[in-house]
Design a protein with these regions (language model features):
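A conserved acidic beta->alpha catalytic loop
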Residues: 5-14, 35, 59, 63
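Short alpha-helix within the catalytic core of nucleotide-sugar-dependent glycosyltransferases
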Residues: 13-14, 43, 52, 66-78
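Glycine-rich, basic loop-to-helix element that forms the pyrophosphate-binding segment
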Residues: 32-50
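Short aromatic/hydrophobic "clamp" motif used to bind/position activated sugar donors
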Residues: 55
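Hydrophobic/aromatic residue at the end of a short beta strand that borders the catalytic acidic motif
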Residues: 58, 64-69, 91, 147, ...
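Conserved donor NDP-sugar-binding/catalytic core segment of glycosyltransferases
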Residues: 68-101
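Acidic/His-rich active-site region of diverse nucleotide-sugar glycosyltransferases
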Residues: 91-112, 121
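Conserved nucleotide-sugar donor-binding catalytic segment
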Residues: 111-200
Length: 211
């Protein structure tokens, strides 16, 4: 497990250092730069020499739904022959109790609808997993919103994205969580960013089709 500790000030750094010393399977990375957003932290981890063939998301507040989550994701890569896999998640409170809107599976996004259907939804789902050699060529944008969505659209332009509709991930929300109750201005800014990402991707696909 690679943990990018983006200059934490709440005791996380000290705790991770102790854990990494006790278990070498935990790789504790602290960026040299101070300007990295979530996308930049992804890039730091993916380019690390100990990053394996597949890079799988695990946000700091969230948990995999079972001990077989990673095995299911790797199996999906092998069986579906894809460059990225997106699973299904359950919204919960911090005590793991289900909360609305419940299960998020994006069943409207199917292979039968075609890869362009990803342009019509406002998110790809979770957890997200990548084939590392490709992701190293397509760094995520250094943002803290929509960074994986942007890269997922770029990947789906040329490569298959596999889907898993079984629940793999618990997305936990706690009171005061930055994603739980955003101001309308922030919601609008986030939506504008994704609109721009979709526009850029649509233009790129049109240009590709004209070649």
């Amino acid at each position: 497990m690679i943990v990018v500790d983006n200059h934490s000030s709440d005791g996380t750094t000290e705790l991770l250092a102790q854990m990494a010393e006790a278990d070498t399977r935990l790789v504790h990375l602290i960026p040299e730069r101070n300007d990295l957003c979530i996308g930049g932290c992804w890039n730091l981890a993916v380019h690390h020499e100990l990053c394996g063939e597949f890079a799988v998301q695990l946000d700091s507040d969230d948990v995999y739904s079972g001990p077989d989550t990673l095995a299911k994701i790797v199996a999906a890569f092998r069986e579906q022959k894809c460059a990225m896999v997106v699973g299904t998640y359950q919204m919960t409170d911090f005590q793991m109790n289900p909360i609305p809107p419940g299960v998020i599976d994006h069943k409207e996004w199917t292979e039968g609808n075609g890869r362009n259907n990803a342009l019509r939804i406002n998110g790809l789902g979770a957890p997200r997993a990548f084939w590392t050699p490709l992701l190293r060529k397509l760094d995520l944008p250094n943002t803290s919103y929509g960074e994986v969505y942007a890269r997922g659209l770029r990947i789906s332009r040329e490569y298959r994205i596999g889907r898993i509709y079984d629940g793999l991930y618990c997305c936990r929300r706690w009171e005061g969580n930055s994603d739980a109750a955003l101001e309308i201005e922030k919601v609008n800014a986030n939506n504008l960013y994704k609109d721009r990402v979709r526009t850029w991707e649509l233009e790129a696909r049109i240009a590709l089709n004209r070649k």
